[in-house]
């Protein structure tokens, strides 16, 4: 029987792309407990306001809320606990060098399944100023208007 491809996006941090410039994105595994995986597969995860930080050469995700699994009575853990990211040592060293720069943060962009395992798309991000956000919204509005006019023009 052939392996099935299940690269299903489970959660996305849309606010991250609005609040930050994403310089680079990388895939990382995440250490979870069984009931957390079941809860994530049910879509009961929230990436809003979560971030990653580095402690003693290891990378952890903070403020990622995974709701307790309904049938997982004593095996449920704290919904906001720190969760370790699984990366190669060379990747961690490179990220340490990048994060030491001023104004750079590690932000989880999305959570997805890859071959039955939960993976995190981790972004190396720089914060946007308010005028950058306005410029982005203005560009989107102009593009939307141009597309609308092209559609009207090509309709007949």
From Swiss-Prot:
Domain of life: Bacteria
Cellular component annotations (GO), alphabetically ordered: cytosol
Keyword hit for Cell inner membrane: no
Keyword Coiled coil annotated: no
This protein's UniProt keywords: Cytoplasm, RNA-binding
Pfam families assigned: SmpB
UniProt xrefs under CDD domains: SmpB
Molecular-function GO term, any one: RNA binding
Subcellular location: Cytoplasm
GO annotation terms (biological process): trans-translation
Major localization class: cytoplasm
SUPFAM superfamilies with a match to the protein in the record: Small protein B (SmpB)
InterPro entries per record: SmpB, SsrA-bd_prot, SsrA-bd_prot_CS
NCBIfam families listed in its UniProt record: PRK05422.1, smpB
UniProt record similarity statement: Belongs to the SmpB family.
Function: Required for rescue of stalled ribosomes mediated by trans-translation. Binds to transfer-messenger RNA (tmRNA), required for stable association of tmRNA with ribosomes. tmRNA and SmpB together mimic tRNA shape, replacing the anticodon stem-loop with SmpB. tmRNA is encoded by the ssrA gene; the 2 termini fold to resemble tRNA(Ala) and it encodes a 'tag peptide', a short internal open reading frame. During trans-translation Ala-aminoacylated tmRNA acts like a tRNA, entering the A-site of stalled ribosomes, displacing the stalled mRNA.
Record HAMAP family: SmpB
Identification of the protein by name: SsrA-binding protein
